[in-house]
């Protein structure tokens, strides 16, 4: 406790947080999180989200190794496959192919085709 039997701001915040967590359930936190996200999205632009995403990605990459990314990728893939059907994958494959074709030329496809053929021959 701070001087004169007064709580510090930090102590008061911690106690308030503990009390709140005892009095509310998961749905409460989901609801206030959604409201906060909506309010934030109204106040910030695309660049803001790109910047915080980049900073978060850099911080995460410093704290995790290759196995971490393999594990979360596998979990994400499993969750996605449980929630989507064949048509979903056909659609995202088509969109990805279109985007790739806009960004690459004939030489790119010749190079990756050659690499794929070489890899297959080495198996």
UniProtKB/Swiss-Prot annotation:
Sequence repeats lie at residues 13-32, 33-52, 53-72, 73-92, 93-112. Keywords: Repeat, Stress response. Residues 13-120 are annotated as: 5 X 20 AA approximate tandem repeats. Pfam families: KGG (PF10685). Residues 1-123 are annotated as: Disordered. Residues 1-29, 41-109 have a biased composition (Basic and acidic residues). InterPro entries: Stress-induced_KGG_rpt, Stress/Virulence-Domain. It comes from the Bacteria. Induction: Glucose or phosphate starvation, and addition of decoyinine. Also by heat shock, salt stress and oxidative stress. Involved in an adaptive response to nutrient deprivation other than sporulation. Glucose deprivation induces sporulation and several other adaptive responses. Consists mostly of well conserved tandem repeats. This is Glucose starvation-inducible protein B. The lineage of its organism: Bacteria, Bacillati, Bacillota, Bacilli, Bacillales.
């Amino acid at each position: 406790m701070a001087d004169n039997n007064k709580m510090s701001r930090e102590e008061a915040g911690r106690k308030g947080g503990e009390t709140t967590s005892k009095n509310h359930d998961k749905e409460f936190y989901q609801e206030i999180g959604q409201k906060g996200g909506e309010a934030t999205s109204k106040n910030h632009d695309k660049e803001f989200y790109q910047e915080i995403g980049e900073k978060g990605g850099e911080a995460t990459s410093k704290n995790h190794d290759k196995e971490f990314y393999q594990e979360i990728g596998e979990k994400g893939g499993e969750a996605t496959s449980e929630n989507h059907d064949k048509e979903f994958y056909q659609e995202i494959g088509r969109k990805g192919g279109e985007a790739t074709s806009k960004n690459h030329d004939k030489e790119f496809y010749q190079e990756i085709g050659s690499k794929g053929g070489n890899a297959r021959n080495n198996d």
